[in-house]
Amino acid sequence: MYQPGILGRRKRVCKPWTVALTTTAALLALAVLIGLLVYFLVYEEKTHYYQASFWIPSIKYSSDLSEEQSKLQINLKQKINNEIDVIFQRSSLKHHYVKSQVVNFRPSNDGVKADILIKFQIPRKNADTLRSEADSILNKKLQSSQSFLKRDISLPYLREMNAAQAEHILNSNCGLGMEYPRIARIADGKPAGSNSWPWQSSLQVEGIHLCGASLIGSQWLVTSAHCFDNYKNPKLWTVSFGRTLGNPLTTRKVESIIIHENYAAHKHDDDIAVVKLSSPVLFSENLRTVCLPEATFQVLPKSKVFVTGWGALKANGPFPNSLQEVEIEIISNDVCNQVNVYGGAISSGMICAGFLTGKLDACEGDSGGPLVISDNRNKWYLLGIVSWGIDCGKENKPGIYTRVTHYRNWIKSKTNI
């Protein structure tokens, strides 16, 4: 008996040109893959970080060098960074040198010692010779009588550092944010730039944004005391970092909340608190501290400042997911204390900012957030903390902020910052 045929099945025969085409395509794909692999292993640039130590015999160590943002520290750091910039920008590594940064000053019996972090980007194929080449360049230049820097022979010259630790150090300087000026308004619903305000954080309860805060140290925030009127237990709070609330850069739990001893919920004075995080954050281009001004810092009326936050875009309006910013002006306390403005309610611990014409202002949900000003070196300082006001953007009712300089010593007493 014959076996019945299987319906629809027949033998396929590949034509020679089909086999050739398939083989060629496979070989081409393999060649591309090998090419990419070779490029990655040989030509792709890799970042390298080296720590170097130098001796400066011409300068005597002073306690001012350990004081953050002191004039002596700022000037010496800039002088050293400029010297390293010139050395490498005029060398065979000029296309691979990225930047340098002074990490620390140390006392020496005969001068000052400085620890410096140097960043390079170089193809992988040349990575093996980078350290020796950089070492040779530095040695040659520093032996010159024109250089005020000398090699610190007590330590290995160039010590490689891992990327995470190095980036943390490179971004540890305060106040590095938006390049001023830039125009955007909370009232228009325009979001802030991606790395504009890297100290801004969100204080949340059960994942809901309630207040803003500013990062002033790897484990410390400063914010408004009234943010904790209803929720005083630190365990209820979490902190979110990053430009968007829905996709945070990182989060932390809260270890403790320190509210100013004289704060009372029924008044606006002493509206300041500091928050200690459960663990330190790792600094990056998107996560940095804002600078704190000294208690003697003065700001003039009409000075341009920025306030940022995730507050309502207008009175009783929607809340954004992306961080918003608005540029406003400092208004003197005398003007804000006029009868038709706030009628004497503004104390020396407060600062007034906005416009008497209204429109541009902080709003509900911005409480605790930063009011910042830029200096001539493009460093941003925390002038105020969003505290209170009447409505949002109302005529003759500008925003009122806690004056940070007034509480500078209090902040230092609680955080050692």
UniProtKB/Swiss-Prot annotation:
**GO terms assigned for molecular function:** serine-type endopeptidase activity
Recite the lineage of the species: Eukaryota, Metazoa, Chordata, Craniata, Vertebrata
In what way does this protein cross or attach to the membrane?
Answer: Single-pass type II membrane protein
The answer on whether this UniProt entry bears the keyword Secreted reads: no
Which SMART domains does the protein's record reference?
A: Tryp_SPc
InterPro entries found in the cross-reference section = Pept_S1A_HAT/DESC1 (IPR017329), Peptidase_S1_PA (IPR009003), Peptidase_S1_PA_chymotrypsin (IPR043504), Peptidase_S1A (IPR001314), SEA_dom (IPR000082), SEA_dom_sf (IPR036364), Trypsin_dom (IPR001254), TRYPSIN_SER (IPR033116)
Q: What is its EC number?
A: 3.4.21.-
The UniProt entry's GO CC annotations, sorted and at most eight, read:
extracellular region; plasma membrane
Q: Which Pfam families match?
A: SEA (PF01390), Trypsin (PF00089)
> According to the UniProt record, which cysteines are disulfide-bonded?
211-227, 336-352, 363-392
Query: Where is it predominantly found?
Result: membrane
- Which residue ranges are assigned to the Cytoplasmic compartment in the record's topology? 1-22
Q: Which residues form the Peptidase S1 domain?
A: 186-416
Residues of the active site are: 226 (charge relay system), 271 (charge relay system), 367 (charge relay system)
Q: In which tissues is it expressed?
A: Highest expression in lung and tongue. Also expressed in brain, colon, heart and liver. Isoform 1 is the predominant form in tongue whereas both isoforms are expressed in similar amounts in lung. At the cellular level, expression is confined to epithelial cells within the cleft of the circumvallate papillae extending into the ducts of the minor salivary glands, the respiratory epithelium of the nasal cavity and tear gland ducts.
Name the protein family: Belongs to the peptidase S1 family.
Tell me which Gene Ontology terms the entry assigns under biological process.
proteolysis
Give the protein name, as stated in the record. Answer: Transmembrane protease serine 11G
Main EC class of this protein? hydrolase
Domain SEA span(s) in chain numbering: 46-165
Spans traversing the lipid bilayer: 23-43
Taxonomically, the superkingdom here is: Eukaryota
Localization: Membrane
Instruction: Give the Extracellular membrane side ranges.
Output: 44-417
Keywords, alphabetical: Disulfide bond, Hydrolase, Membrane, Protease, Serine protease, Signal-anchor, Transmembrane, Transmembrane helix, Zymogen
